[in-house]
Amino acid sequence: MKLSPLMALAGLASAQLALALPQATPSASATPSPTPGDGSFASTNGLQFVIDGETGYFAGSNSYWIGFLTNNADVDLVFTHMKEAGLRILRVWGFNDVNEKPADGTVWFQMHADGQSTINTGADGLQRLDYVVQSAEKHGIKLIVNFVNYWDDYGGMNAYVQAYGGSDNTDFYASKDMQAAYRAYIKAVVSRYLDSPAIFAWELANEPRCQGCAPSVLHDWIDSTSQYIKSLDSKHMTCIGDEGFGLDIGSDGSYPYGYSEGGNFTMSLALPTIDFGTFHLYPSSWGTNNDWGNGWVASHGAACKAAGKPCLFEEYGVTSDHCAVEKPWQMTALNTTGIAADLYWQYGDQLSSGQSPNDGNTIYYGTDEFTCLVTDHIASIGSRATRK
């Protein structure tokens, strides 16, 4: 998901406000008694996922902002509510790139400047992500952690381009210097959580594109990067984080099925170092209609079935009529062979600093929309499992 400039500022403001609030200590935040998982690593079994020994279809959500919170109690609250609701997977942004160090205590993970990169392992850096992983372990929630953003939100590939030289984000994929810095960051993050059962999968990027590039550019980067991640960690799964562009199966000739953004869904899914497929759905941004989304979901399910790997319906959202629009997509995903889980964009909750960021797609815990798209959806998942 690409955030609007207003949303990016709102996220920063939320983090800054949280800094001014009393901070929960690790001992205080450990007072609840959540039930963790069984300590096993998530995996695939044919066209399905396996979480804590359970094979089936799973529901989850996205939270780009949770790793930037500075109040531990807020992090615990999110995972407590997710656990209560039956959400099993949360996709979080494992990047927060800047070109100059913030002066106000804002959380940042990596700084790129003058051809060099500095990883922040301090209290306003990766220690915030540490707590997210720690709390997820306690609550039995699995995390998808990605390493860079295609978009400029929280730095993205453009932060590398600004520091190392280049014209646009497409230069990121072939630059030796940028890739060296990117891989150093991957190694720093992966090494911190190598033995954590909370990690569902490592993800190369949020919505990587290479507009106007030959398909080989993005594919070769996916191939080499996923091999590198597997060389560091063979226990956790690896995925791309792409939108699912570039697909012939079920194609109606519309923009998302085409290859203009440099992606080839089928070709990259076939890589042995990619454990499952990912795809997103935003009809309003792609020039399609909401009903079109059901065919998009079915097409990716068919592609994953043909590849013998599960598909994760990783992001989907609209800014109005959430239940009426998104419920059919959920049901299509649940009933399509090859689709193994879905994560709506995005999770919302009431934090100590106020409501979590709302980009219009947000579904807040405890609301009627949450009942429709989470509570009822998870009941449908349970009902299907019982029928089987």
From Swiss-Prot:
Record has Cell inner membrane as a keyword: no
Signal peptide: 1-20
Gene Ontology biological process: mannan catabolic process
Ranges annotated as spanning the membrane: none
Residues the entry annotates as binding substrate: W93, N206, Y282, W345
Class of enzymatic activity (EC top level): hydrolase
Keywords: Carbohydrate metabolism, Glycoprotein, Glycosidase, Hydrolase, Secreted, Signal
E.C. designation(s): 3.2.1.78
Subcellular locations according to the entry: Secreted
GO terms under cellular component: extracellular region
Glycosylation site list: N264, N335
Catalytic activity: Random hydrolysis of (1->4)-beta-D-mannosidic linkages in mannans, galactomannans and glucomannans
Molecular functions (GO terms): mannan endo-1,4-beta-mannosidase activity
Taxonomy, superkingdom: Eukaryota
Function (record text): Endo-1,4-mannanase, a crucial enzyme for depolymerization of seed galactomannans and wood galactoglucomannans.
Family, per entry: Belongs to the glycosyl hydrolase 5 (cellulase A) family.
Protein name: Probable mannan endo-1,4-beta-mannosidase A-1
Species for this entry: Aspergillus terreus (strain NIH 2624 / FGSC A1156)
Origin organism lineage: Eukaryota, Fungi, Dikarya, Ascomycota, Pezizomycotina
